[in-house]
Amino acid sequence: MDLWQLLLTLAVAGSGNAVSGSEATPAILGRASQSLQRVNPGPGTNPSGKPQFTKCRSPELETFSCHWTEGVHHGVKNPGSIQLFYIRRSTQEWTPEWKECPDYVSAGENSCYFNSSYTSIWIPYCIKLTSNGDTVDQKCFSVEEIVQPDPPIGLNWTLLNISLTGIHADIQVRWEPPPNADVQKGWIVLEYELQYKEVNESQWKMMDPVLSTSVPVYSLRLDKEYEVRVRSRQRNSEKYGEFSEVLYVALPQMSPFACEEDFQFPWFLIIIFGIFGLTMILFLFIFSKQQRIKMLILPPVPVPKIKGIDSDLLKEGKLEEVSTILAIHDNYKPEFYNDDSWVEFIELDIDDPDEKTEGSDTDRLLSNDHEKSLNILGAKDDDSGRTSCYEPDILETDFNASDVCDGTSEVAQPQRLKGEIDLLCLDQKNQSNSPSTDTAPNTQQPGVILAKENKPRPLLISGTESTHQAAHPQLSNPSSLANIDFYAQVSDITPAGSVVLSPGQKNKAGIAPCDMPPEVVSLCQANFIMDNAYFCEADAKKCITVAPHVEAESRGEPSFNQEDIYITTESLTTVAGQPGTAERAPSSEIPVPDYTSIHIVQSPRGLVLNATALPLPDKEFLSSCGYVSTDQLNKIMP
């Protein structure tokens, strides 16, 4: 429908001016141009078989040319059969007439060339094709819209560098702009596009457009040959011109061998596997040394442990075995002298020569004059010639906790005062009966001094003598025994052969010493002043011999009725029936050593003493001394 309308419009215009080419008004030309662009907007196929515009181009924005095709229905070529007419608008008005093409030869066959005299930029043009006076095709455009530059010329390349592997190389491609384009003066601005490919490939690789006339091409293989071409376009335009001639690039072979494939060192994989391997090695090291690393970072808390003691004994509650082990080692022995601080040590005065004639060493040791001395514990004794000091080589003992604990001095004070009163009473009676006491044999008293407490404290007497030899040092001054307690009850016998003595209890048998006859008191009081004690058989014989007149009274009223007494004897009744044997007892009495060597300060007034070595008696005097109980002693005493 539009085509018929166009033909009708052209027919009306042709009838108005048939000779001059039918000058049309601008309004009619504008409508015809719009109709032509809607019908045939650009070059393409010609389905109707009539002549048609193929393209219009300006290579440098100064001239342009248009090309068309012949119709298929024209069997005979007639130079004057197809004509091109154009019209342009100047000063906002269209020219009133159509003008024919100025040059049909310069641009080639079926073309019209417009030189610079007929070319104006920024001004629209309209062209039409006529055949035998009929318009067959029409087109309107502006010169800057149809610019398609000529191909660049003078392509060449330059080698930039070769890779270290000798496989790839970089080149620089250069060219010259089209010769007819006034690029130097800036009349036209061109953009260039470079394309390259390997010779045997069909797909071109395009690079980004550039404004310069040179561009680098990277990573070309040395063993390949490449084709390079360049084309251009006006800046901000979408239509490129023709491609330049193909440039062949043949890179020199620098490597001694031809590589078929590019060798890329797998640095990334090596780094990944290296990190993974190091991590695994670190984990294996930590796993194998985890206990040692744990001890270095978090050292274990040391378990409380006593050297030489098995911890299983403490867990099982075997405290007796632990105490035995502690008693064996000198470092863990209990310090018996730390409970009461009012007696620190015993001072032996070696400067006073008069004391040598006053009595034995035991008398001076047990006297009250040196009870609170402060120094010279280890001074050399004048009589014995030995050093009286603490010797750590004490025999191994087994003390319980109850044997070590000391009672308070306040509790022991009344009992001590009572003992002093009894001893004073005994001393008075001895003085009143001096004739009888002078003839009596020397009495023997225990030589161990300890503080009297609430409960009995065992005393260990260590020495090389056997357990059947009792320690009875001789006392020349009976009045020095006023403030001492005698330990005569054996509470235990250690495996080493030492006896542990406990203090006896005074005046618990129900007999007052002051009421006894003076003869008995003077002779037997020193030996039997304590109940709960062991008594030597020889001492019992002395008492029986000296005091026969009180035998019936002693049997009628027993003086030792204390319970819980463990007394041992071999043949006490036999001795009682043989008075002759009792008479010979004093003559067979063995010498008693003095205990002047201190082993342990066990309590405030308790000492562990060593017996002074004495010459061995004859074999006939080495009979053992039997121990008798108080009940048996009462039976045999007169």
From Swiss-Prot:
Motif (UbE motif): 340-349
Gene3D superfamilies: Immunoglobulins
Keywords, ordered alphabetically: Cell membrane, Disulfide bond, Endocytosis, Glycoprotein, Membrane, Phosphoprotein, Receptor, Secreted, Signal, Transmembrane, Transmembrane helix, Ubl conjugation
Pfam families: EpoR_lig-bind, fn3, GHBP
Signal peptide (from-to): 1-18
Entry keyword Ubl conjugation: yes
Location of the motif WSXWS motif: 240-244
SMART domains assigned: FN3
Example GO molecular function: cytokine receptor activity
Modified residues (Phosphoserine): S341
GO CC entries: external side of plasma membrane; extracellular region
Positions of post-translational Phosphotyrosine modification: Y487, Y595
Chain ranges passing through the membrane: 265-288
Disulfide bonds: C56-C66, C101-C112, C126-C140
Residue positions the entry lists as glycosylated: N115, N156, N161, N200
Region ranges (Required for JAK2 binding): 294-379
Extent of motif Box 1 motif: 297-305
InterPro entries linked: FN3_dom, FN3_sf, GHBP, Growth/epo_recpt_lig-bind, Ig-like_fold, Long_hematopoietin_rcpt_CS
Membrane topology classification: Single-pass type I membrane protein
Family as reported in the entry's similarity comment: Belongs to the type I cytokine receptor family. Type 1 subfamily.
Listed name of the protein: Growth hormone receptor
Lineage: Eukaryota, Metazoa, Chordata, Craniata, Vertebrata
Chain's gene name: GHR
